[in-house]
């Protein structure tokens, strides 16, 4: 398969920065894989490969891209196959286009984690990775402050919510994560006031389940931090929501644990931190399961036209 990768306009030190799919480029003249959002909107590239029988795109931006452009669906239908982290957009577009959409979790490269010392002691109790974008995020930090915690973010925030670590490289983040008992996650993207208008500009938008409850102020977005945590053997506490997108690939109480409210998070975090060894079977099961989604395995599925 011919590999076309372009990362301009994207965060450079993220888990998807290290797929190195170029290593699989065999200069095929009939099959091509595009990686990187900029490739999906590059008309020059699309013209160059338009006659290839199989044209694949790895979509890691859905459904968030619908909030900022009116051309998402047009961009996708150029491809014969799209592998996307949004199962709801995949279902919607499978019903309305000739492109085959296949849901996948966020892929990772195992090379990113080859220096992790899995025998190192857990020096920290809990970690949250990401920006603080809503009141619930602030409440999470308030709870974490009762423990030896880490908050890693790409940018600073006002006091008293200044992250403990700002704009650290991914290698440092993964090392810290591997030394932490619990990772807190929300597979949700907060909606800004202008986002619903952009989304509703798409014909049939209401048939995409990702947009079924915009009144909640959120839409589903599967987070790479879930994958990173599982690879670092850190127990994942995930917010239960209207979608629970994680259940497309992982099982609750087998690979992760739900929290249902801030109060529930308060009590569950206390119990886990103080009884961590009793949750080790979940950590190990998640580590084993997540191997299925390593980028080489995903690529082989793409080659063989297989679903996950």
Model-flagged regions — what are they?
Residues 1-24, 28-30, 34-47, 51, ...:
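Nucleotide-sugar donor-binding catalytic core of glycosyltransferases
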Residues 188, 236, 254-260, 301-308:
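Short, contiguous hydrophobic alpha-helices characteristic of membrane insertion segments
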Residues 229, 256, 286:
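Hydrophobic, well-ordered secondary-structure elements that form the walls
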Residues 256-262, 272-276:
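Conserved acidic donor-binding segment of nucleotide-sugar-dependent glycosyltransferases
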Residues 274-307:
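A charged, aromatic-enriched C-terminal amphipathic alpha-helix characteristic of glycosyltransferases
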